[in-house]
Amino acid sequence: MKKVFSILSLLILQINCFAVTIETTKDLNVYYPEYSKIDLVCGQMPKTSQKDVVFCCEAAFTGELLNEFKHLNIADNHICNGEMKKGYRCKANTGGFVWGKGKWKFMRKADFPTAANGWNMGFCQLLIIHNGETRPIGSKMRKSRTIYRALCEKDGKLCIVESKKVITYEDFVKYLKDFKVKHALYLDMGSGWNHAWYRDNGKVVVLYPKTHNYCTNWITFYK
């Protein structure tokens, strides 16, 4: 009986340990979700009552402000729950990300797969840093100011990196470079689009309020 109790206690401890590790620098907040699966959830944002969700935030751009959801309103083709979905063509997108069975890949948009081929999720966005090299910054984007967010790979781990305050895009890129991320892919931001939440030790932490229902897709990390 004591042995069974010890095993149950260990299992409970393992379940409760799933959380989000947070690292901070002078300019950035860095979130490392502890997860076993990633998906691109489309149509409706994961609810805070879903106990298996660790972290979720907006991923790809949304085209039009529509009252109903359709995959064609998501920028470029994307993979949801192992299925390739057709989106609208977006010239601003220069890169992409895919994940499946514990493996992931950041890439140029030209290399984004044409079929799911075993990848569980994927989406296209603005590629900021690839293999440690900063990608070209458009003149219109350079001085654009907001709180920025990116999906990154740092020291072999996936993380969500966010600026602590409103800054220029040019400065955000510099801070990511100084933080020495290997890859960085932009995540949709702006008022309402920045709404996100994560679970830390069983408690839900909301990042920025929800202001509208026009968001269409969320990168979601699961236990």
Language-model region placement:
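Sec-dependent N-terminal signal peptides
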Residues: 4-15
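Gly/Ser/Thr/Pro-rich low-complexity, intrinsically disordered segments
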Residues: 18-223
